[in-house]
């Protein structure tokens, strides 16, 4: 009987160790962020956001579960925006236009992503 309990405990322990819920998934990669935000390029230069843009913003927002996720996404956005002409004041408007909370920060070259609020 004790042997069965030990085996059962080991089996449950292995299941718990091997189970990786979403909250433990890695932060989104910059390639993922770029693909998600690609439909928003027009918005960042003055147009209205498309449905695809808002869907992407909502998906990206849902992937930013931890401060590390938010910092990673912010740094990716900073890197991506180096290569396009855009109005950094429009970035936070994505949240309003697409109905997303929390707000996206105004990302520019001077933003220290590590100091974003929790």
Swiss-Prot record:
InterPro entries: Bifun_inhib/LTP/seed_sf, Bifunc_inhib/LTP/seed_store, Plant_nsLTP
Gene Ontology terms: biological process: lipid transport
Pfam families referenced in this protein's UniProt entry, alphabetically: Tryp_alpha_amyl
Cysteine disulfide partners in this protein: 30-76, 40-53, 54-98, 74-113
KW Signal (keyword) present: yes
Signal peptide: 1-25
UniProt entry keywords in alphabetical sequence: Allergen, Disulfide bond, Lipid-binding, Signal, Transport
GO molecular function: lipid binding
Family as reported in the entry's similarity comment: Belongs to the plant LTP family.
UniProt xrefs under PANTHER family: NON-SPECIFIC LIPID-TRANSFER PROTEIN 2-RELATED
Function: Plant non-specific lipid-transfer proteins transfer phospholipids as well as galactolipids across membranes. May play a role in wax or cutin deposition in the cell walls of expanding epidermal cells and certain secretory tissues.
Name the UniProt record assigns to this protein: Non-specific lipid-transfer protein
Record organism: Ambrosia artemisiifolia
